[in-house]
Amino acid sequence: MAAAVRAAGCLPALCSLQAGHFLSRQLSLNAFPVAATSFLAVKTALSHGSLSSRETRRNHCLTSLSHVLQTQCCVSSPGNWTGQQCRPYSFFTKLTAEELWKGALAETGAGARKGRGKRTKKKKRKDLNRGQIIGEGRSGFLWPGLNVPLIKSGVVQNIGQRSKEEQQKVEATMVEQREEWDRKRKIKVKRERGWSGNTWGGVSIGPPDPGPNGETYEDFDTRILEVRNVFNMTAKEGRKKSVRVLVAVGNGNGAAGFAIGKAADRGDAFRKAKNRAIHYLHYIERYEGHTIFHDISLRFKRTQIRMKKQPRGYGLRCHRAIITICRLIGIKDMYARVTGSMNMLNLTRGLFHGLARQETHQHLADKKGLHVVEFREECGPLPIVVASPHGALSKEPEPEPEVPDTKLDWQDVKAMQGLKRSVWFNLKRPAT
């Protein structure tokens, strides 16, 4: 480090030189004992006879001070001694551009975090470094190798300066280019419509990102099921806001999964959720590639789901989240009814829980040791064998008294007995 500059006031008396101009910070000699010792040694030597001559004292003083103050001053010549330090230090050099923009746009208060303030008067942040060229300035100097080519027509160019008119044209072009960039940024790309309106439910965000070993998931698609703002009360930051995203992924061929992503930014939450869902896949068995094997009735917490197997061409008549998940799985025909709580997370977990545990025809045939047959309306009384046991065939038929323990739904009972009618059934309408 350098010595103190308070000693600069003693230099004219000691060295018989003109005092230089020191643009430096005032420091104490006690803070730099090495520099103080060197300076005192110079002062002692100058007062004795060995260095009594005028020229000898001047040369020795300059040599000693150049070592003592080597980081604080520049010694040019014995006759013209000047010390200068250039250290730009201001309020704007202490803060980053991000912090300055936050102060200019008032984004650091509690009102900005809670969404207060009129959005119509809100200023937008600009990247002032965008479009800047190293060497360009208001003076219009031309620096070879920076803002102009170093060699032109085989000749090395010299430093020049634009005229006032040319400099005004260059600045006007830069302003026009920035305005064009701002207009392009305001243009919104219309994303795919989800379930309704401008909500995120049902919107596709593409396949998950490639894995660390180079594996890709181009045949998978990701659909958003729910986007919610959640808050956590912390001692340091207070009411801290986060975005929680529930997504489902699938390839349309039986492989599907779901996961939750949480982050302060919505885009980061989307990325976390879809990259996590690809690691929690379920394989869902499908009957003939279009529907479930049998009717399923389940209850997950406060949500009840009843799913029914349907013939080909029936379509998906379900809750909109169930329709989205079934398309990711590859189920094309199914009826589902949801009662109770409509919590999206419980609905998704209950649906995967029921579909992943359905019993296939082959598993039923192996368990019973009998052929599994299906009766279709178009085939009449002719049974169609859909599965046969792998082991020995049981010669004893299934006992008759065995009745499946199936809970009946009152709405289905009313429909079977003809008690279920429309609310408009007895309404008398005027003749038209």
From Swiss-Prot:
Pfam families: Ribosomal_S5, Ribosomal_S5_C, Ribosomal_uS5m_N. It comes from the Eukaryota. The keyword Chaperone does not apply. Residues 220-284 form the S5 DRBM domain. Residues 113-127 have a biased composition (Basic residues). GO terms for cellular component: mitochondrial inner membrane; mitochondrial small ribosomal subunit; mitochondrion. Keywords: Mitochondrion, Ribonucleoprotein, Ribosomal protein. GO terms for molecular function: RNA binding; structural constituent of ribosome. GO terms for biological process: mitochondrial translation. It is found in: Mitochondrion. PROSITE patterns: RIBOSOMAL_S5, S5_DSRBD. InterPro entries: Ribosomal_Su5_D2-typ_SF, Ribosomal_uS5, Ribosomal_uS5_C, Ribosomal_uS5_N, Ribosomal_uS5_N_CS, Ribosomal_uS5m_N, Ribsml_uS5_D2-typ_fold_subgr. Residues 110-130 are annotated as: Disordered. Its main location: mitochondrion. The keyword Mitochondrion applies. Belongs to the universal ribosomal protein uS5 family. Component of the mitochondrial ribosome small subunit (28S) which comprises a 12S rRNA and about 30 distinct proteins. This is Small ribosomal subunit protein uS5m. It comes from Mus musculus. The gene is Mrps5.
